[in-house]
Amino acid sequence: MALPFQKGLEKYKNIDEDELLGKLSEEELKQLENVLDDLDPESATLPAGFRQKDQTQKAATGPFDREHLLMYLEKEALEQKDREDFVPFTGEKKGRVFIPKEKPVETRKEEKVTLDPELEEALASASDTELYDLAAVLGVHNLLNNPKFDEETTNGEGRKGPVRNVVKGEKAKPVFEEPPNPTNVEASLQQMKANDPSLQEVNLNNIKNIPIPTLKEFAKSLETNTHVKKFSLAATRSNDPVALAFAEMLKVNKTLKSLNVESNFITGTGILALVEALRENDTLTEIKIDNQRQQLGTAVEMEIAQMLEENSRILKFGYQFTKQGPRTRVAAAITKNNDLVRKKRVEGDRR
């Protein structure tokens, strides 16, 4: 299917350009030349000899044959002799040849070592085995690995064979893998829902297969639980939805004192939710949020520092700050909170 503008070009396909140019007058040809110059000022499509316009309107005074001119210039160049050098080149070398200086070879002179008479007598009367043991203590490995010394010890009286340099290493202590977390997830969840007084600490660390809905149920059950004081879910693949659920729990819970969510997949959004929830919590004294999959960023760290400066109950905060400013502010805030606790304890002891 032809486009509308293509249909209009069909009639120009069979036009003879030479016939059209032959019908144009000199003025029309000049106008056409000016139009072409405007379209292509550099005349990149023309040979170099035709790009410049004629600078005069005068007629030529004689015939011009380009081939004849080139032949004449080539003939003149071959017939003209080269100019001789004013100073002919003789190949003579001038100056001195560079010879690098040889560095003197340093020869080491062995120093004569004089021993005490008692040591000389002891070494003179020592057996080969004693000398071998002494070399091992002093670290003289050349003597220990010398085959000539082995032959001498073999030929000695009372020796059954050569003494080899066998160094016995210490036995490697077996490093056993940590046993899996023995916590029964379902049983702990049911105890929390039943508000069991015997359950005061829940440790779910390193249990990788806990579903996200189950972790949310733990957070939901903590809202009404009045006995659990320490809850830890480090390295459980928890993410932002879990962090948001625990943030809602912190706004309601009045018993929990320690929360650990380290080594998880929580981003800055989840951490900020937990930090904001601490403004409405009066019982939590310890929270750990370090070693997440991605860095929290400067903005989140500044929010954490501002919250801790306004919170007088957090005594332990587990996070390694990347910036000096928030780190200094948080350290000062935690120190201030611990000083307040110490002052209250001292005042209570005085009473």
Swiss-Prot record:
GO molecular function per UniProt: actin binding; tropomyosin binding
Keyword entries, A-Z: Actin-binding, Cytoplasm, Cytoskeleton, Phosphoprotein
GO cellular component: cytoplasm; cytoskeleton; synapse
Claim: Cytoplasm is one of the keywords in the record: yes
GO BP: learning or memory; neuron-neuron synaptic transmission; pointed-end actin filament capping; positive regulation of G protein-coupled receptor signaling pathway
Source species of the chain: Mus musculus (Mouse)
Subcellular location: Cytoplasm, Cytoskeleton
UniProt family annotation: Belongs to the tropomodulin family.
Tissue specificity field: Neuronal-tissue specific.
SUPFAM superfamilies, per database record: RNI-like
Known role: Blocks the elongation and depolymerization of the actin filaments at the pointed end. The Tmod/TM complex contributes to the formation of the short actin protofilament, which in turn defines the geometry of the membrane skeleton.
Residues with Phosphoserine modification: S25
Gene name, Swiss-Prot/TrEMBL: Tmod2
Disulfide bonds: none
Protein name (Swiss-Prot/TrEMBL): Tropomodulin-2
One Pfam family this sequence matches: Tropomodulin
Subunit record text: Binds to the N-terminus of tropomyosin and to actin.
Keyword Phosphoprotein in annotation: yes
